[in-house]
Amino acid sequence: MQQDEVIWQVVGHEFCSYRIKGEAQNFCRNEYNVTGLCNRQSCPLANSRYATVREDNGKLYLYMKTIERAHFPSKLWQRIKLSKNYAKALEQIDQQLLYWPGRQIHRCKQRLTRLTQYLLKARRLALKHQPALIPIKPKQAHREASRERKALIAAKLEKNIEKELVKRLKSGVYGDQPLNVNEEIWNKVLAAREGLIDEGEEEEEREEAELEFVSDDEDEEEISDLEDWLGSDQSMETSESEEEESSESESDEDEDEDNKGKIRKRKTDDAKKSRKKRAPHIHIEYEQERENEKIPAVQHSW
């Protein structure tokens, strides 16, 4: 048989796992406690006849415990669903707790009132649009804050520079007009640039107009080979004609050597110019006709 006084002596004075000690009063965190206070009348363990109101998924239920079901722990509490209408719920409590103490009925009604207010407030908050809360990492938040701070400093610096420039313009530090407003200065600069461009084009035209002389040694070699071949087939001429021809050939050879020396010098100079200027090359060939030199007829016998 259950003894309420014995249970309270153990639970109330010695030890209870549901008790929370406070400075002025102790509290109870048992889910079936109707007031939340730790005392003899409110303790659900030390009272064999007990009633309370609980909320489950937005619905209110009346829980009742009697001494007849104390030996069935699975059937210890009887649950009755209460109406959503507050007035009807109060009537249900009065009907179910008709022969119960008045203090117990009053406490159940108080708990019903508190839970009803709580549910109404929760429904109102659910209807309102609330911003979604996104967790932010502390490092990322610190990084973004530092970036914002640097951006503000840069913006203030730009504004200060702008203000300083406006003050200088108003005070006349740059004269009547700043440099980028006066058109005459820009016209002078453009004219100077155009003059430089024209001079560069004239220099390029001069480089292109310069001629380059190149000697043709192959023709001279062919002529000498022809003379040797003809000399082998010819008859011996008179000594006077040979002396005249030898003197003329020596003079011609001297002239050819002088021409070759000059041409080589020109080649070296022109090669240096061409490396520097990179102008196009123009080849000119000169043919020299010798009137005094007679080439005898060639007779072939095949």
Swiss-Prot record:
Residues 282-294 have a biased composition (Basic and acidic residues). Keywords: Cell cycle, Cytoplasm, Nucleus. Residues 198-302 are annotated as: Disordered. It is found in: Cytoplasm; Nucleus. InterPro entries: Mak16, Ribosomal_eL28/Mak16. A motif (Nuclear localization signal) lies at residues 138-143, 274-282. One of its GO terms (cellular component) is nucleus. It comes from the Eukaryota. Residues 198-230, 239-258 have a biased composition (Acidic residues). The keyword Hydrolase does not apply. GO terms for biological process: assembly of large subunit precursor of preribosome; maturation of 5.8S rRNA; maturation of LSU-rRNA. Its main location: cytoplasm. It holds the Pfam family Mak16. Belongs to the MAK16 family. This is Protein mak16. It comes from Schizosaccharomyces pombe (strain 972 / ATCC 24843) (Fission yeast). The lineage of its organism: Eukaryota, Fungi, Dikarya, Ascomycota, Taphrinomycotina.
